[in-house]
Amino acid sequence: MKGRKGGLSVKLRRGLALVLALLLALSLGGCAAPADAAVLCSAEAAPAGRAMAEAGAGLSYAVAEDDAAALQQLTSGQCEFALVTESGAQTWQEAGGAVSPEAALAVFAVLSRAGDYGAWDRNTRVVIVGEAGGFGDSLAQQVLTCALYGSVRYDDLDAALSALERGTADAVLGMIAPQDEGVSRALGRVRNLELLSMPESLIAVRVPDEAVREHALELGGQTAQTYALFGALCTGGAVSTAQEEAVYRAAQEAGILSVGAPGAILE
């Protein structure tokens, strides 16, 4: 009788291999916990999608070729949300495409009661919205290199706008939306408050994020050139309240959502 080699038999080894392969397939496939929502971004909005995915547990994102491709896949049910430029969403709607709701994401803006940058001096008190090193701070620092100014501090948007109204600040910079109610109120209540354009010296400078693009904003009859990030967060409609809240929360935590909650949607 021939001696058997030590170890598992061939059949047993094959059986174990099949079991392991099945477990691996299940872990990668249908038995995995589903994402809260999937966001498909145009290439220009990819940095925003990445920031949202990092901020929202269970949120996934992928990159499409362009705005039209992202919105096409959204309407065909391949994802729950699309993150595209505002112009891309508008073009899609004008062509008869249905995307709803459409939320404004954060834009970089400068509100000043001290006139344009050339009028700023060492007495100009500047507030940057957010924290040092936060989203938008790099742009704010580039703006400040173009202006002569005095002191700089960081605060949240409400406090910054209140400082403008009280006269304890002369300029506010940061990722804010000029159409927000607080900004509209400040523009109405603060004498000589202006929504400034990006300094000409920055127009040709590569700003920190490739997704930043020149964009015209209108507010109260005023038109200002500023730089907009990302544009519009759209959904095709077949989205649960929980998914909607999750993606809005992720956008807010990533610092890119100017409309703070579902339902507060721009027309």
Segments the model singles out, each with a brief description of its role:
Residues 105-119, 129-131, 198-242:
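A bilobed periplasmic-binding-protein/Venus flytrap-type ligand-binding module shared by bacterial periplasmic
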Residues 44, 86-89, 113-115, 131-132, ...:
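Solvent-exposed coil/turn segments that connect beta secondary-structure elements
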Residues 50, 65-97, 161-163, 179-186:
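Pocket-flanking alpha-helical
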Residues 35-64, 106-162, 166:
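Bilobed "Venus flytrap"/periplasmic-binding protein-like clamshell domains
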Residues 86-115:
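Signal peptide-directed extracytoplasmic domains
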Residues 2, 6-63, 67-69, 75-78, ...:
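N-terminal hydrophobic or amphipathic helices and topogenic motifs
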Residues 88, 125, 136-226:
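Pocket-lining segment of extracytoplasmic ligand-binding domains
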Residues 56, 78, 83-86, 90-93, ...:
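Sec/Tat-exported extracytoplasmic proteins
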